[in-house]
Design a protein with these regions (language model features):
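N-terminal helical cap/lid subdomain that shapes the substrate entry/recognition surface
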Residues: 1-98, 122
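Acidic, Mg2+-coordinating phosphoryl-transfer loop and its flanking beta/alpha structural elements
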Residues: 159-182
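Short acidic capping loops at alpha-helix termini that bridge into adjacent secondary structure
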Residues: 36-40, 123-127, 155-159
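Substrate-recognition/cap helix-loop segment adjacent to the acidic, metal-dependent catalytic center
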Residues: 22, 29-31, 51-59, 82, ...
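Conserved SAM-binding loop
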Residues: 6, 13, 104-105, 160
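Short alpha-helical
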Residues: 19, 48, 110-111, 165-166
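Short, flexible loop segments at the rims of nucleotide/cofactor-binding pockets, characterized by
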Residues: 78-84, 107, 180-182
Length: 182
């Protein structure tokens, strides 16, 4: 029997394509880099920021450091306003919470606490794990395993709702059921 429903964030709880593309393009402009190309735009929604930055820097430590420096002092609010959550997200999550424990397992990092509040989901999740926890990002199973540990639920009694290949791979590696959306 399923006891825990874990959710990815981007592409599952909300549409973040416009927000993520604008976020990375803003950072890249600040460090003199061109905007994301089409392939990078796809990765910008699913991959951790550290992976997107590392791929763009191509081994250039100074460029990578400059990207991280820009993010330390930037205002996230304009990018949060571009997120497209369904109007019924909070009521849906509260209804689900009556029957299951809920968790958020995402490759996002520093934006997670503010994102949860922005979406009106404060107090909804029984466990949250992200790249902010200093674990390997998905497709590694670490983020999902950390959610399981924090929720106190065995993998066989959990399901992960995701929208990408890396979500499916993380779920399989963590030994949890998977529901693909999008």
């Amino acid at each position: 029997m399923i006891e825990l429903v874990m959710f990815d964030a981007d592409g599952v709880l909300f549409d973040s394509t416009e927000s993520n593309v604008a976020y990375y393009n803003w950072i890249f402009a600040k460090v003199g880099e061109p905007p994301l190309d089409r392939d990078e735009e796809v990765k910008a929604v699913s991959y951790a920021a550290s992976e997107v930055f590392a791929a763009r820097a191509g081994g250039d430590a100074a460029k990578l450091g400059a990207m991280h420096d820009v993010t330390r002092n930037m205002d996230q609010a304009p990018f949060f306003r571009m997120l497209r959550p369904p109007l019924e997200l909070r009521p849906f999550m509260l209804e689900l919470k009556q029957r299951y424990k809920l968790a958020l397992a995402t490759n996002r990092s520093a934006t997670v606490p503010a994102l949860v509040e922005h979406l009106g989901l404060g107090g909804v999740f029984d466990a949250v794990a992200s790249a902010l926890d200093q674990v390997r990002p998905k497709p590694a199973p670490d983020i999902l395993r950390l959610c399981l540990q924090r929720a106190g639920i065995d993998a066989a009694r959990a399901v992960y709702v995701g929208d990408s290949r890396i979500d499916r791979e993380a779920a399989a590696s963590a030994g949890v059921h998977f529901i693909g959306v999008g």
